[in-house]
C-alpha cells in the first residue's frame, strides 16, 4: 500500500485501508497517524478532520474526538458534518441535554441554512437506522421541523422520501402536497403524487395534479399525457383533444418520440370516436412517423 501511495499519492481509500490494517495489528498510534497525515495533506477539506474525529470517537478516544470536532467548527462554524458529529459525541458520552440542544440548534433554527439542516437530517436518519431502525424518532423530528419552518420545501421533500422508503405512502401524500403548496414547480413531488393517483385510478385527482402541473411546468409533456388520459376517462373528449394539441406545441427535437407518437395515437382515437375519419387517419399517420411500432396506432389503422 505504501508503494501504491507513492505512485498515486495519498487518498482517502488508501489511508482508510492502512488505518484498518494498523488497527488489526493493534498499532493504534500508526493507525491514527495515517488519518492525521491525510488531514494534513488536505488542510482545506474539513471532511478528513471530521473523519479523524469520528474514528477517535469510534475507538474510544473521546477527548481527542471532541478536540478535533471543535477544531473543525473553529474553522467552519456551519460545517454540518462536524456539528452533527459533536451531537453524536454528546450522546455517546451521556450528555443527553447537550445532545438535544445541539440537534435542536441544527434542525430547529431558521438561521441555519436549509441545505445544512437537510444534510444534518440525513445524518440523523442514518444514525437512527443504524441504532434501532425506529422511525418514530425520525418522524417526530421531521414534524417539529415542519412546524418550525413551514415555508421550506426541502425538508418536507426529504420527509416524504423517508416515509416512502418506509412503505408509508398514505402518510407521504399530505407532506408531498405541502411541498407543492410551497413550490408548485417541484416536478418530483407532483410526479410522485401523480403515480399514487394513477395506481388508485383516481382520475379526478390526476386532473387536479396535472392542470396546475402544466401551468407550473409547461414543458413537461408527462402532465399533458396523463391529463389527456384522465379527461378521456371522464368522457371530456374535447378537453382531451385540446390538451394533446397544446402538448404538441411544446414538442422539441429532444422529446421522446414514443410519447409524441402516443399523443397523435390518442388524438386519432378521439377523432375516430367522433366519426372524423380523415382527421383520425392523419393522426395515426403522424403517430407512426414518430414510432412505427406504435401498437395502438397500427391496430386502429387496420
Residue ranges of each PLM-predicted region?
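Alpha-solenoid helical repeat scaffolds
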Residues: 1-302
Amino acid at each position: 500500500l505504501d508503494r501504491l501511495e507513492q505512485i498515486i499519492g495519498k487518498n482517502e481509500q488508501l489511508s482508510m485501508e492502512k488505518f484498518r490494517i494498523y488497527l488489526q495489528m493493534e498499532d493504534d498510534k500508526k493507525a491514527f497517524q495515517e488519518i492525521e497525515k491525510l488531514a494534513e495533506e488536505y488542510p482545506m477539506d474539513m471532511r478528513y478532520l471530521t473523519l479523524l474525529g469520528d474514528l477517535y470517537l469510534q475507538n474510544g478516544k473521546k477527548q481527542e474526538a471532541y478536540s478535533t470536532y471543535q477544531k473543525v467548527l473553529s474553522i467552519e462554524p456551519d460545517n454540518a458534518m462536524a456539528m452533527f458529529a459533536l451531537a453524536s459525541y454528546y450522546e455517546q458520552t451521556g450528555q443527553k441535554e447537550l445532545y438535544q440542544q445541539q440537534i435542536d440548534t441544527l434542525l430547529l433554527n431558521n438561521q441555519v441554512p436549509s441545505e445544512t439542516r437537510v444534510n444534518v437530517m440525513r445524518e440523523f436518519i442514518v444514525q437512527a437506522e443504524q441504532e434501532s431502525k425506529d422511525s418514530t424518532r425520525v418522524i417526530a423530528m421531521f414534524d417539529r421541523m415542519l412546524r418550525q419552518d413551514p415555508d421550506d420545501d426541502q425538508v418536507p421533500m426529504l420527509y416524504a422520501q423517508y416515509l416512502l422508503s418506509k412503505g408509508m405512502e398514505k402518510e407521504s401524500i399530505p407532506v408531498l402536497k405541502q411541498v407543492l403548496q410551497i413550490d408548485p414547480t417541484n416536478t418530483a413531488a407532483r410526479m410522485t403524487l401523480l403515480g399514487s393517483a394513477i395506481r388508485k385510478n383516481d382520475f379526478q385527482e390526476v386532473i387536479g395534479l396535472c392542470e396546475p402541473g402544466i401551468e407550473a411546468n409547461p414543458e413537461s409533456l408527462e402532465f399533458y399525457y396523463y391529463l389527456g388520459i384522465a379527461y378521456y376517462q371522464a368522457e371530456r373528449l374535447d378537453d382531451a383533444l385540446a390538451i394533446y394539441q397544446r402538448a404538441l406545441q411544446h414538442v422539441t427535437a429532444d422529446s421522446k418520440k414514443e410519447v409524441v407518437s402516443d399523443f397523435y395515437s390518442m388524438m386519432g382515437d378521439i377523432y375516430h370516436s367522433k366519426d372524423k375519419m380523415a382527421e383520425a387517419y392523419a393522426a395515426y399517420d403522424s403517430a407512426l412517423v414518430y414510432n412505427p411500432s406504435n401498437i395502438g396506432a397500427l391496430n386502429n389503422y387496420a
